[in-house]
């Protein structure tokens, strides 16, 4: 298994972005569902400054990292979007929650800065993003 991971070719920019869009739609659905639950628990009334607002903030901020970390750790380095686009996360070390969360943080910041972390793939010979380099991981094509 490890030898196969070494010889897998790294995924390019577009497969990663299409996978990201696919996963983002799923995460958006999760956020909407949890928001609906919070509104229901609050009796359907909007409340400013209460515990419901704090829970909503938590749901909005942490749904993505929890989604990605869960699938990467439990599903052999693949989210649903990654499965659809036949790519997977491979780590030089054993994949841990720390690596997953760091990767999410680097990916988020690189996206917020005009996608520079992802655009770096075009200039990197190994097709690695800045998040890949920072976390000693890579996104590889699978057959």
Residue ranges and their predicted role:
Residues 2-143:
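Membrane-interfacial and juxtamembrane segments of integral membrane proteins
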């Amino acid at each position: 298994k490890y030898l196969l991971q070494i010889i897998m070719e790294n995924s390019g920019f577009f497969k990663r972005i299409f996978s990201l869009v696919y996963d983002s739609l799923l995460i958006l659905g999760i956020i909407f569902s949890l928001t609906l639950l919070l509104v229901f628990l609050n009796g359907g009334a909007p409340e400013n400054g209460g515990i419901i607002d704090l829970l909503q903030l938590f749901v909005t901020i942490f749904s993505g990292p929890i989604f990605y970390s869960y699938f990467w750790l439990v599903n052999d380095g693949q989210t649903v979007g990654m499965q659809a686009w036949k790519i997977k996360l491979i780590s030089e070390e054993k994949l841990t929650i720390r690596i997953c969360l760091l990767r999410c943080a680097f990916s988020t910041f690189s996206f917020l800065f005009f996608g520079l972390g992802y655009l770096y793939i075009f200039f990197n010979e190994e097709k690695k993003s800045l998040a890949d380099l920072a976390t000693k991981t890579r996104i590889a094509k699978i057959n």
